[in-house]
Design a protein with these regions (language model features):
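Aromatic "clamp/platform" in nucleotide-sugar-dependent glycosyltransferases that forms part
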Residues: 101-103
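Nucleotide-activated donor-binding/catalytic signature segment of Leloir-type glycosyltransferases, i.e.
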Residues: 64-83, 88
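Short alpha-helical segment that forms part of, or immediately flanks, the ligand-binding pocket
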Residues: 88, 110-115, 129
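Short alpha-helical donor nucleotide-sugar binding micro-motif in glycosyltransferases
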Residues: 88-94
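Short hydrophobic beta-strand element within catalytic cores of glycosyltransferases
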Residues: 119-125
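A charged, aromatic-enriched C-terminal amphipathic alpha-helix characteristic of glycosyltransferases
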Residues: 143-144, 157-188
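Conserved donor-binding/catalytic core segment of Leloir-type glycosyltransferases
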Residues: 17-38, 44-49, 56
Length: 188
């Protein structure tokens, strides 16, 4: 068995060490645009509780830029949807991503974020992580409450290593269950 870690694995481990929230954090908000169903305004408002935080938003609308400027929030952005590879590169630069929408039943974005080693908050409109302590960490029950989103961000960042460990455990269990079900289906 090879115990040598790649440079990428070492970088992920270093980034995932517990970070002091007071140092400012990088928060990603992606694929939300300005549609109300995507809940972008509440997610942005939740970030104002973190001094010196910076948000990365893709795509961004003129209205969202105005909102960010009114709230005096530091941000980076791209005005349009971008290729997946470029989005993945942006995702991994953050301490946490938020995807607390009102409408998603099985969004890919949270899985993509976790796969890049970055925890992602979700809304309570899906069945991700049910039966796992991970759901208690990352699922926002009241999507329209910026204080709950803020509290979840704090809790996840304070327990980032455990959250990522729980994700890996959940993923392993999920993959095993899928293999079992596919086998049962194929064997009739």
């Amino acid at each position: 068995m090879n115990n040598v870690k790649s440079k990428e694995e070492n970088e992920k481990e270093e980034k995932n060490k517990t970070k002091n929230i007071e140092d400012g954090i990088s928060i990603g908000i992606y694929n939300a645009h300005s549609r109300e169903l995507k809940n972008i305004y509440t997610q942005i408002l939740a970030t104002t509780f973190f001094k010196d935080s910076k948000i990365d938003i893709v795509p961004i609308s003129k209205e969202i830029k105005e909102y960010l400027n009114i709230l005096d929030i530091e941000y980076t952005c791209i005005d349009k949807f971008i290729p997946t590879e470029e989005l993945m590169n942006r995702i991994k630069r953050n301490d946490i991503n938020v995807y607390v929408t009102f409408t998603e039943c099985s969004p890919m974005f949270p899985m993509e974020s976790f796969e890049e080693g970055v925890p992602c908050l979700i809304g309570n409109n899906n069945d991700y992580f049910i039966g796992s302590k991970l759901r208690e960490y990352v699922c926002v029950d009241r999507e329209d409450d910026p204080r709950e989103i803020r509290d979840k961000i704090k809790i996840v960042l304070e327990n980032k290593e455990e959250v990522l460990k729980l994700y890996r455990e959940w993923k392993n269990n999920f993959n095993n269950e899928v293999k079992k079900q596919v086998k049962e289906f194929l064997e009739g």
